[in-house]
Amino acid sequence: MKLIALGDNVIDYYHNTQECFPGGNAVNVAVHAARLGAQAEYLGSLGDDNMAHIVEKALQENGVDISHCPVLQGRTTKVCSYDVVNGERSFLEVITGESWTGPLQITAQELDELKTADLIVSSCNAKMPEQMAVQALPAVFAYDFGEKEKYRTDAYYDEVCHSIDLAMLSCKPMDKAAFAELCAPLHRRGVVHVLATMGAAGQMLSVQGKIVEKTTQMVEASDTMGAGDSCCLPLLAVYCGVAKGKAHAGAGASGCTGCRAAGLGTQLYGTGRLWL
């Protein structure tokens, strides 16, 4: 299976411990896919600053192909700053600077590379909703809508929901009725599977309205950064054995079971100290 993770890369900076880690939805997904044995590629714009070199090093050391990423001269990497206490993060600020690389612009060259994928994973954090027509490619397409309400409006759904096989959302704990209501506008737009991760409350998956629910295997988490990204990979690994656009409740149930511990306590990559 060849996976291409399409979109963002950042540096996650832990202000109170002065540690930094490569991150971003697409970077995390690519690394976790490689660790599961997939042929993994990251496709996104890279800067040429020291932070970009940290991201590149982490991806390459984890076996992720970055050979098709455009490197933008004189551009910088976004830094997301957090405080982390007892494994739980609290957001502080985003530092983009005046020369941030910005979203990837898909050209014919990138499109040709995307055609080689069995699975494409992207997210709202890629900041490229107008380019999500890449869903028309033969690959299975998964999209992470994150946790913010601005990515759950009818207008946003209309822009990005072209042919999504799996939609992922980070949510507060909810019951099945509330989850069904959350899924309805996505299913109406042709999304086959909708996965909600709810932290310690577990996960729910809707397969064209049929809901599968799983609890969480509790562990002592050392770090929750990237937990949702790692959670989706077991499901996708199973689902990719199924034809694009087809419902498969068994694949979803198996994937959710695998998710119970996969995303907890997973620290992507340590790079030492970062002084800002």
Label each region the model flagged.
Residues 8, 12, 144, 223, ...:
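Acidic active-site catalytic centers that drive phospho-/nucleotidyl reactions
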